[in-house]
């Protein structure tokens, strides 16, 4: 079976500074895959490598087996990859509906049926479709950002720390939204600092340290891994607390 997304020995960084040192990972159909690691591990950089936001010095990025290494972001979007960055991921002065319409900018068909599906997936947005997106709660703004990306019916959705800065209540809501999106059949690659909650919903996970692969396993196995617990989860088995 061909992986939806594959990074194979990817190296690269910003300017003269190399951050990724030969990392490899895969996302299979219908999976949620989580990348965790300490600050500076290269988690977000790995995601930007997929989306064409930095020049790679080595390795390959493949979508459905086809090479997309070092392609421009607009090319990557048209091929079915949508990326929700951690910040500045909505148009705050536009309404919720206008944000979703912006998400459909590369579609050349009638996007209204898809918008109806997005409102069904995110009921709070349907209630506030005319409201300026910047006036919503942090959790609802993240829903707008994800809904905007989902307007393109992507082959894979990339989420960079979707719960960053949110209260525990809103974090829980966003993880539920991630599961709901995945339940529609959309594979998800997610970078997340809230390792325990992320691994609880993940099919598989990758631990990056200093721009290199450290551990990869199922979400459940990583939760029970003592090394992972010591590094990111406060010591002891993650699922014991």
Residues covered by each model-derived region:
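Glycine-rich phosphate-binding loops of nucleotide-dependent enzymes
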Residues: 2-241
